[in-house]
Amino acid sequence: MAIHKIKFFAGRGSRYLAEKIVASYGTTLGNSEVQQFSDGEFQPCFNESIRGCTVFIIQSTFPPLDNLMELLMMIDAARRASAYKVIAVMPYFGWARQDRKDRPRVPIGAKLVANMLVAAGVDRIMTMDLHADQIQGFFDVPVDALYASGIFVPYIKSLNIEEIGRASCRERVFVPV
């Protein structure tokens, strides 16, 4: 079985998180940039070869529109640059609350976003705390839906806070000086 080099890249919406992720792996982010045009359009570019590599693109889709479009374009660029696999790491999956039709003549936004990611060429999705588990079924590629509660709940319990969630009135009320 061939071993493919792994490279990590960050979208502009998740650079801080991406730097923390790669630091924990003892590596650095790959070299990429986004060219901004005067009309508001932008064009991501990988400034190093990713041919044959497994590429992780770390990008939240909040605020959704520009970050989602940047992620889609980075996926497409990676695919066109002959990446072996393209994995989108999406800490926040925008439009996830639109997981069903709740009234007539409305879209199912989560399914549309899933279709766009697959059409762009993603091979796998990693995301956190999806609004609804059924969203995983909207994709034609594997989805790793991770849950922060597995990390946060044990930590919070370890603090031994007796009255968690019950702040005193004095702590919640702003009193001007």
Which functions belong to the PLM regions below?
Residues 1-172:
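PRPP-associated nucleotide enzymes
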